[in-house]
Regions:
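C-terminal motif of bacterial Sec signal peptides marking the signal peptidase cleavage site
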Residues: 12-15
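Edge beta-strand at a domain terminus
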Residues: 22-27, 31, 84, 138-140, ...
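Short, exposed beta-strand/loop patches in secreted or surface proteins that constitute
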Residues: 28-51, 141-148
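Surface-exposed helix/loop patches within compact recognition domains
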Residues: 48-144
């Protein structure tokens, strides 16, 4: 009798709809991924971690998305976000940056889902103001150049399953100063 109860309990547990039994959500997008960004919000957080490094974030929007007066995103398109870009300057200097988790100069953080909060480097696919898909990037680089046409950003990013994503931005780089509370 104990064996029957044990087997029934095991069958019950295995058949439950738990995260263990659900297939993982793929990290590669199923929707079109825009790769040319037309609007940007550059944010400066100062020496946010008290590590003698300036911390920045870049929020990029593809055509179809826009910021409202409070910098909330609306519309349909792609939003590429990079947080925790580390430099020793008061702005993001020209050069090559690598995705890293060490918080060294000329690096930026990989995408992470930390207890339900998405941070680091990620892509949101937005349709009619609703997030349809999230892509976390695990490795890659960013090249920054300044020209007569403004700031030029070139991204070579990879997901956990090695899916490649190339994106660019060319335009102004106006910085907003943010506090620790506003991150």
């Amino acid at each position: 009798m104990k064996h029957i109860v044990f087997i029934l309990l095991l069958v019950f547990l295995v058949s439950c709809d738990s995260p263990i039994n659900r297939p993982p959500i793929p990290n590669t997008p199923t929707l079109k991924m825009d790769s040319i960004y037309t609007a940007a919000d550059f944010r400066s957080y100062g020496d946010y971690y008290n590590a003698n490094l300036q911390v920045f974030a870049i929020d990029l929007l593809s055509e179809g998305l826009a910021y409202d007066s409070t910098f909330h995103i609306s519309g349909s398109g792609c939003n590429l976000f990079l947080s925790d870009i580390f430099t020793t300057c008061d702005s993001i200097p020209a050069g090559h940056y690598e995705m890293d988790s060490t918080a060294k100069k000329m690096t930026f953080l990989r995408g992470m889902n930390f207890e339900g909060n998405i941070t680091g480097t990620y892509l949101l696919q937005i349709s009619e103001d609703n997030i349809q898909h999230i892509v976390l990037f695990q490795s890659g680089s960013m090249d920054v150049k300044y020209t007569d046409q403004g700031t030029h950003l070139d991204f070579k990013l990879y997901t956990a399953d090695s899916t490649y994503y190339h994106a660019t931005y060319q335009g102004p780089s106006k910085y907003r100063i943010k506090s620790r509370k506003e991150k």
